[in-house]
Structures are given as structure tokens and as C-alpha cells.
């Protein structure tokens, strides 16, 4: 079950960590072909997670961030980690369902602790919604490819890109909002609850990022109205959020919708126009099922549905008064800070 080429390295890890050369039991938890390998192993009667990273790239940042999170009580205890061998052994979390009302308090509390840690290393590539704020050839190519693909009708694509330009024009990258980020919390499987404590797992995408990125992607799964938003943000900030914090949070939630709509529509459709005849699930219902692990994004059809769900929700949000109000609030704060008002691009 262990890849043959990693057998010796796993044996060394077991020996260094537990003084044994084999485990008592093993269960393969690998999600799908091409994924990092994951196994539940039993050693001396206790369960651990053995992870073998198969994706290319330096593991140093991943393991550094994972260890920092574990030291802070946010991630399971790290028993063994070898960046050279790309292997880690951590405590295994026997997860139970975390209901959304409980998550509204537990998750922002955990994120507050995470974002207060010493700075994380940078990453070679941004795989989060803040990628849309990184001007340069990579972003230009990403957007040009989407526009040229005609995945969505031209008028819808242009509306999305126009609104995106408005957000990008006013959403300044503030040093005060940069914080250690997990950056992969749109996947519910990376948020585990053992019945007593919350654990954040899989730190492969961790790096220093805008604090609102983590907050937004989780909120897009579990925050369904303004009352829940207040609970969520008050738990994070430790006090009622002001209008500027709520505006930045709201705009980041829209950036997340944009990012996942474009990314997953592109992945799921292989860059071709999508079939619009199939009905789209109601956003809140879909995210409720996604949060409950009832929906998998493994195949292209599921990816397309996920992208469409985000696009439909974004389409509704773009026409709400709060969208323009959030743009105004953030733009006005920029004017105070810079001494001049940021002009918003107009929507055609």
C-alpha cells in the first residue's frame, strides 16, 4: 500500500519517531489518483496520519507553517516531518460533524489565533482569491484565457470583469491585514472537529496573505445572512466590526466568488462553453451539502456545478446595493489615507 519508492523512508520515520519499523494497521485515505498519499496508521495502539506528498515543490514552507500551527494548538501534533523525503506523521483526528451554528464561533476564533502568529514564508504562486489582486502577466493570462474561452455568454463575462475591475481598483493590499494564512479552507475536509476542539489540516498552501481571504472562503460556506455575519466577525475581531471591516470582508467574499467561479468553470468545462440547460442548485443548499461533505469536486461535472453556483451567487450580489456601498466605503477610506478619492471604473 505504501509506494515502494517511499517504503524505506517511511520505515526510517517510524523508527525515529516510535522506535518501531512497522505499523500495526493501515488504511488508505488517498482521495483520488494524483492526490498526495494519505494513510491512517496504528502504532503502539494509537492512530496517526501518515502523509506522503507527491506534488512537486519545496516542502520546507509547508512543514514550517504546519509546525507553527501545531505549536499554537491549531493543527494536530507533528510527530515526524522530513522535507527531503516529503513525509509527515501527525496525530490522527477522529472527526465528527461540526454544525454550522457552532462553526460560526469556533472557526473565526481559530483564525484569530492563526492570524496572530509570526509571519509565514511567502509562496512561489498564489492559489487563493487574492491572486486576482496581483497585477502582472500571470493574472492577465488567467483573465484573458477565461474571456477567450466563451465559457459564459459574452455579456455575463464582461459584467463579471467590469465588477472585478471595480473591486481591484479600491481593494488596497494593507500591511496591517497581512497575516499567516492557511489559504485552503474552501475545502471543508481541511477543517476538522473532534467533538471538543477544532483542527486545521493540510498546510500545503499556507503563506502570508490577506487575513480576509481565509475569513471570506469559510464565510461563503457557513454565513448565510447579516446576523450570522455579525456573529462571525465579532468573534474574529473580539468586538463588533466597523463598517470598513465589514466592507473589506464583503468585497473579499465577492473576490472569492469570482475566483472560484472562473477557476472551476475553466477546470470543469475544459475551456469550452458550458451547457446552461441544467438547473443550478440554490447556493445556500449547495454549500450546506458541501459543508456536510455530501458533495465531491472530483469530476469535471462537479467542478462545473461548483463554478456555476459561485457565479450565480455573484451575479445576484453584484446587483445588490451593498456591493456599491462596500465599494464606496473602501474607496472613501482610501481617500482619507491617500488624500485623494479613488475613481471607480464604470460598469458598461
Regions found by a protein language model. Name each.
Residues 276-282:
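Short, surface-exposed loop/helix-turn segments at secondary-structure junctions
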Residues 1-81, 86, 169, 174-179, ...:
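Conserved NTP-binding catalytic cores of kinases and kinase-like/nucleotidyltransferase enzymes
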Residues 212-244, 254-273, 286-297, 302-306, ...:
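Active-site activation/catalytic loop segments of kinase-like enzymes and analogous catalytic loops
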